[in-house]
């Protein structure tokens, strides 16, 4: 019955005509549902009264190898208010162990979308049609909720592969299929005073380094800008593991200065969220300093209803509905797209075929 509901949902929405976005009017665009692209602190707060959010995000599949890093870095750690730290996992389908996705969710971490195929080349994502993005992203939302047995409504965020923007289309799919925010868009120009998350009701002022970027009015679609770091040679890098230069691996003081210098650019200015955007291998090779961490969706929730840091720290910790994992080990399943054999570790019944683009549940 659940699969029938999901299938009906995926066929119920059609692409709509879009209007060109105009310059943002702060008097018309107000929280909680609209925000102009801006470096101003939400709610008119002073920096000293604003929480400094730090978001640690990981891309790609979750498996028995990289989960060991996640357990070591994230489990049994709390922020200064004694609430558990939260990271965001932008998960791609291939080679993902959905039992481990369920484990991460039950530990309070955010599960978000990174496509089913993660196909190459990046130019595919730049030109992908509405239907292609729907099959990769909207279908993945129901796929990951089903196979990891996590609440459908808790899957809120998207990051497209290779940070390749898709213009208006991906945001239209995101809006049509109940996704709240996108965290794909690099921000390399606005780094001294970073952009806070904003909506696409009106035209964005964010620089477009990996076009095409959205130009339409897409009410209620949130952008979480990926504010670039600056490497030791002064060059911007969005994914920290893609910086062209690094401190010496054996010099912990240099690494500490590298991280703190980038952090202070946020903390000593307008306290825009400080993003630590990486793949798992980087953390396992270069362990991070201890810091307070929240998820990307936590940041969006605060921006929609900003409160001073004293009030924020006094709030009760979030609670999450725990979900069971009726474990199944499935395979080998031969994939039709490449003829490779896969094993799947799921929190649901085994599919008849290897799930893939166009057949996210692996139905006959």
Curated annotation (Swiss-Prot):
Q: What's an example of a GO molecular-function annotation for this chain?
A: chitin deacetylase activity
Q: Which GO terms describe its biological process?
A: chitin catabolic process; polysaccharide catabolic process
Positions annotated as glycosylated: 168
Origin: domain of life: Eukaryota
E.C. number, please? 3.5.1.41
Q: Which UniProt keywords apply?
A: Carbohydrate metabolism, Chitin degradation, Disulfide bond, Glycoprotein, Hydrolase, Metal-binding, Polysaccharide degradation, Secreted, Signal, Zinc
Q: What are the annotated disulfide bridges? A: 24-36, 29-34, 83-317, 208-213, 237-243, 325-347, 330-350
Tissue-level expression reads: Expressed in midgut where it is found in the peritrophic membrane, a semi-permeable acellular matrix which lines the digestive tract (at protein level). Not detected in foregut or hindgut (at protein level).
Domain NodB homology: where?
52-292
Q: Which cofactor does it need?
A: Zn(2+)
Keyword Iron recorded: no
Signal peptide range equals 1-15
Reaction catalysed by this enzyme: [(1->4)-N-acetyl-beta-D-glucosaminyl](n) + n H2O = chitosan + n acetate
From the Swiss-Prot or TrEMBL record, state where the protein is found.
Secreted
The entry's Zn(2+)-binding residues are: 60, 114, 118
Q: Name one GO cellular component term.
A: extracellular space
Give the induction text. Answer: Up-regulated in response to 20-hydroxyecdysone (20E) and juvenile hormone analog.
Q: Which family does it belong to?
A: Belongs to the carbohydrate esterase 4 (CE4) family.
Q: What does this protein do?
A: Hydrolyzes the N-acetamido groups of N-acetyl-D-glucosamine residues in chitin.
Concerning PANTHER family, the annotation shows: CHITIN DEACETYLASE-LIKE 9, ISOFORM A (PTHR45985:SF8), PTHR45985
Q: What is this protein called?
A: Chitin deacetylase 7
What lineage, starting at the top, does this entry show?
A: Eukaryota, Metazoa, Ecdysozoa, Arthropoda, Hexapoda
